[in-house]
Amino acid sequence: MKKKIKEVIVVEGKDDISAVKNAVDAEVFQVNGHAVRKNKSIEILKLAYENKGLIILTDPDYAGEEIRKYLCKHFPNAKNAYISRVSGTKDGDIGVENASPEDIITALEKARFSLDNSVNIFNLDLMMDYNLIGKDNSADLRSLLGAELGIGYSNGKQFMAKLNRYGISLEEFKKAYEKINMK
């Protein structure tokens, strides 16, 4: 029996809908990629946002991140779910549609709200202390840690911003960091 998700899951395309519905029992809404800026998706999503809540699940690429930013401007209290680049890539194609049902379920379980708090725990010094910036393997570490925390991959500065924006505690960060270093 598939896990039931109460929020509406927002994806980019029709193949993403199929992949998500294969993984969970949920209402899924397609924004048609960058066409979200031109069509009536925002108006339609407002009702779902107010009544059920939204989970934004876009592709783990630049275009997906741009679409996520656009949606988050309109729906600041939506949850964000991330598929890793590794689990979202098949034969050179990157997208939610390539992720396994298990990876989609994991991403949805790790979905996070963006917090509007003024306390930033993570700074450049901490990022350097944990080799998340400035080292040859920093990008790989951020990719693994982003997948473990459910916040996706980003460059160093954006990764630090996500850690703060999603309210990740230092304890949660350290546990995830230890876990990826045991693999």
From Swiss-Prot:
Q: Which InterPro entries match?
A: RNase_M5, RNase_M5_C, TOPRIM_dom, TOPRIM_RNase_M5-like
- The source's superkingdom equals Bacteria
- Entry cofactors: Mg(2+)
The record's cofactor note says:
Binds two Mg(2+) per subunit.
Q: Which residues of the sequence carry a binding annotation for Mg(2+) 2?
A: 59, 61
Q: Which residues bind Mg(2+) 1?
A: 12, 59
Q: Which UniProt keywords apply?
A: Cytoplasm, Endonuclease, Hydrolase, Magnesium, Metal-binding, Nuclease, Ribosome biogenesis, RNA-binding, rRNA processing, rRNA-binding
- Per the UniProt entry, the Enzyme Commission number(s) are 3.1.26.8
* Coiled coil regions in record: none
NCBIfam families for this protein: 5S_RNA_mat_M5 (TIGR00334)
Name of the featured protein? Ribonuclease M5
